[in-house]
Amino acid sequence: MRETGIKPIVIEEICDIARKYNVQKVILFGSRARGDFKTKSDIDLAVQGGDFIRFMLDVNEETSTLLKFDIFNLDEEIQNELREAIKKEGKLVYKANVSF
């Protein structure tokens, strides 16, 4: 995930937290997925399955980065434009039983 500007340890931590809360899928999208991010760009994640609230809290509190996270629940209703952006530019970070 080097082209995203996210340190490998942060990706590992996100995957560990996803496993902990039975998340099925984590998708990176936005500027970090497209590769046009700035140094302080936030990390946009879309999450499917599992305990979304606990996942979101732990990612914000327990990852080794000072970057801000915007985390969206794919199991809830979200704007069509946002859902399309996730489909178009999203990069799979974690899938249950398969991590990257």
Model-found features: residue ranges?
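Catalytic core of pol beta-like nucleotidyltransferases
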Residues: 1-25, 33-39, 48-100
